[in-house]
Amino acid sequence: VVWVSTRDCSAQRRHQKLIEEAPAADLGPGIEEAMGEAAIKAAKAVGYYNAGTVEFIYQDGEFFFLEMNTRLQVEHPVTEVITGIDLVEWQIRVASGEHLPMTQAEVAARRNGAGIEVRINAENPAGGKFLPSPGQITKLVAPDGFGVRFDAGYESGDTVSQYYDNLVGKVIVWGKDRPTAIARTIRALEEMVVEGVATTIPADLAILKHPDFAAMQHSTKWVEERLDLSGVEPPKPPAPADDEAAPLVQRTTTVEVNGKRFDVKMWVPDVPVVTAAAGAPKAKKPTRAAGGGGAGGGSGSGNVEVPMQGTIVKVLVAVGDTVEAGQAVVVLEAMKMENQITADKAGTVKEVKVSAGATVGAGDVVVVIA
């Protein structure tokens, strides 16, 4: 039994990893070796012989056992890039009864440089909300270059479903040291193009460029408690075909198909729209649709809408209840994440239109507040 490397997975949101790196940086003297030895003892104690990932929590120079996953994990490539070891091949060979091809000393001798893996998820990180962003990927251009690898889960034209994991792909980068790996990862993410759905790339870049990350001062709660994502905006429209083309704005319209309502977003020319007002036509410019809101139906309308497709997992209010503006009324699950849908005004619950387990579409009214 050998241990290959440590990894750090502290950059998380909702206890789900965003960025992983190997080896774990800023560990105290002897900590990495002690972790490796503890991992080997754990595997031997239960008679486990295959690829496994042992997780620890590290704080103030001490580490504590969390769990053991009897498999490789999503971030295993970041270990591969600093060792040159194909961990999947090793897993298969061990499962077929072969012996490990290297000793502990040989594994240690192969380690070189630093690796970073960034998960590209179909989520909108605007305002730090990380709302699911299902839809069709109209264009995907992967980064490349020396020390850069991209493991893709989707291609241009594929649709990211609301029912499954929204991992679009993984950017894995190697550098001769941690600062080089960080700089190379930033360059790779800035080169990557994903259109059609929002992704976590803006949040990933904010993390990598932050001085706390460079100084290893971040923790598992750092993204949610310290990282400022207020400046992150929803995806921009595609560039016009030529310089003389009219600028585009995002418009949203609601359509109904077989009794189901859907919000359809379109990028259209920014031209005046004629609306009736006081018996006379009046020109009004369209406005860009707001993104990431927890409740729709207009400000203070009382019609609480869900912003995306999903499943209602919990109803938090009943008819007759008094609620405050911003209070959660239902919990919506989409893409394996729970989202609290909130009241847009204070009042009394007049109607609850859904129950736990119901499937809803974007724009559906779930609660009416009078």
Question: Across the structure, where does each feature detected by a protein language model lie?
Answer:
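Short, solvent-exposed loop/turn motifs
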Residues: H99, R261-D263, A328, K336
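Structured functional modules or segments
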Residues: R288-A370
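Residue-level marker for the onset of beta-strands and adjacent loop->beta junctions
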Residues: G52, G169, Q250-R251, G300, ...
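Residue-level structural signal for beta-strand termini and adjacent loop
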Residues: T6-R7, N69, W267, A318, ...
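Glycine-centered loop/turn motifs
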Residues: S156-D158, Q250, G363
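Flexible, low-complexity "carrier/transfer arms" centered on conserved reactive residues
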Residues: T138-L140, R187, T199-A325
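ATP-dependent carboxylate activation and anion-phosphoryl transfer catalytic cores
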Residues: V1-P240, K282, T287-R288
